Design a protein with these regions (language model features):
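Short, basic interhelical loop/turn and adjoining N-cap
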Residues: 6-25
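RNase H-like nuclease fold core
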Residues: 21-118, 123-128
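Inter-helix linker motif
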Residues: 135-151
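Acidic/histidine-rich catalytic cores and adjacent linkers
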Residues: 8, 68-69, 78-84, 100-104, ...
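Short amphipathic alpha-helical surface patches that mediate protein-protein
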Residues: 16, 27, 276-279
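Short, surface-exposed amphipathic charged segments that create phosphate/polyanion-binding patches used
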Residues: 150-162
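Short, conserved catalytic/metal-binding motifs centered on acidic residues
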Residues: 1, 11, 59-64, 117-120, ...
Length: 285
């Protein structure tokens, strides 16, 4: 009973008590909640909770949505691997000033012992790490970088999908004006063009070796019909390969330089922006 949350009613049979009454008594008197909420810690419990005892040399900071779409900033101890005592701080919202105010509840001696902190590309996250953990080196999580490349591929797919939707709408309107039945052209797998572009999104998130038979077919059709989508997918997969390959820092930089050249030759604006971002944060990747 001490380890797992239970209801007051579940105790009725064992102890011959009124479970609802016991819950009210526990909340109002036994729990000490009314006294705790007026303490320095309790006053800010709606905004943040900080656990200095969980801090370690290797931390991670990220934002996540926990309830009703509300964003929270969470600082975790990487050495706990998501288990008990992982959370160092959880703060409502992403305002860097509020997050810094919460983290400064932890003594500076403890914060100065942090050696490394993993984060994303957000400027506010960089500001938080720089001011709250001044002696920690900052490392940008590779998965945030790969996500940018995947989003760039999806951006091209979405553009083509809207073109297909507009063409389909125009075809239907023309058929209605001419008094004939509109029949959308179907491809060899039975999809219309706009259906192919919608259903093909899942294949573009995966590497080729993880495609199912139908995904492989759809990807092949997409790449045949849209060469720019094929080139964008190739760039994203090349970046994934660079990150997955075990190599020295100098070798990785050489591979990234080659990738930059491929991006420049392809001429995609989104990928050029990603390459510029990589170049700016090269020492932190």
């Amino acid at each position: 009973m001490d380890r797992y949350p239970i209801t007051g009613r579940s105790l009725e049979w064992f102890f011959d008590i009124d479970g609802d009454l016991f819950e009210r008594q526990y909340k109002r008197h036994l729990s000490g909640y009314r006294q705790w909420k007026d303490t320095p810690e309790g006053l800010h419990a709606g905004q943040w909770r900080v656990f200095p005892q969980n801090i370690g040399p290797h931390l991670s900071i990220d934002e996540t949505s926990l309830s009703r779409g509300e964003l929270y900033t969470i600082v975790t101890n990487k050495e706990a691997h998501g288990r008990k005592h992982s959370i160092v701080a959880i703060v409502l919202g992403t305002d860097s000033d509020v997050v810094l105010r919460a983290l400064r509840q932890i003594k500076s001696e403890l914060r100065n012992k942090v050696k490394e902190i993993t984060l994303d590309l957000s400027e506010s996250m960089h500001r938080i790490c720089r001011l709250a953990f001044p002696k920690a080196s900052r490392v940008i999580d590779r998965f945030h970088l790969q996500r940018l490349a995947l989003d760039a591929v999806q951006e091209i797919r979405i553009k083509h999908r809207w073109d297909a939707i507009n063409a389909d709408t125009d075809g239907r309107e023309s058929a209605k004006i001419e008094g004939r039945k509109y029949v959308a052209e179907r491809l060899e797998n039975g999809d219309t063009l706009k259906e192919l572009l919608a259903r093909g999104r899942y294949a573009l998130f995966k590497s080729p070796e993880k495609w199912t038979v139908s995904q492989r077919q759809r990807a092949g059709m997409l790449f045949r019909l849209y060469p720019d989508l094929k080139e964008a997918y190739r760039l994203s997969q090349n970046l994934r390969t660079i990150f997955n390959r075990r190599s020295t820092k100098d070798c990785a930089r050489l591979n990234l330089a080659r990738w930059y050249n491929s991006v420049a030759q392809a001429g995609f604006k989104s990928f050029n922006t990603i390459a510029a971002t990589f170049y700016e944060h090269a020492d932190e990747i």
